[in-house]
């Protein structure tokens, strides 16, 4: 059985930094699911969910083990539903770690089998934010 990971985010818009994390994940894991998370409590962004999915699919078309999906519920439930082993999150700076750490702890309580893997952003992409 291969290792499946989830790369979650709003991806509004998808940045070169996001694409770098997705590409690097695709080299480390058998299957990478990029999931565009829909957060109805946030204001509508620059692009619709469908536009973001289409853009990610076009940008990852040469990565055969990358799949794109959407989800409007809890990430921990999605990971369990997909049979994934972990979530991969990119960190640009130490300031990102605090929020991501708290989210990881919450997800771990909701799904004890779920791991969170932090990947440090490539230095040339550290200042990009969606």
Regions found by a protein language model. Name each.
Residues 1-130:
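Nucleotidyltransferase catalytic core that binds NTPs
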């Amino acid at each position: 059985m291969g290792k499946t990971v989830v790369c979650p985010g709003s991806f509004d818009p998808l940045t070169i930094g996001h694409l770098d994390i997705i590409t690097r994940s695709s080299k480390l894991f058998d299957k990478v699911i990029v999931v565009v998370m829909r957060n109805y409590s946030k204001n509508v962004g620059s692009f619709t969910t469908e536009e973001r999915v289409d853009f990610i699919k076009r940008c990852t078309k040469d990565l055969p083990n990358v799949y794109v999906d959407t989800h409007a519920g809890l990430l921990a439930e999605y990971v369990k539903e997909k049979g994934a082993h972990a979530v991969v999150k990119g960190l640009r700076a130490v300031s990102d770690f605090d929020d991501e750490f708290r989210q990881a702890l919450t997800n771990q309580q909701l799904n004890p089998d779920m791991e969170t893997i932090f990947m440090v952003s490539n230095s040339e992409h550290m200042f990009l934010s969606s």
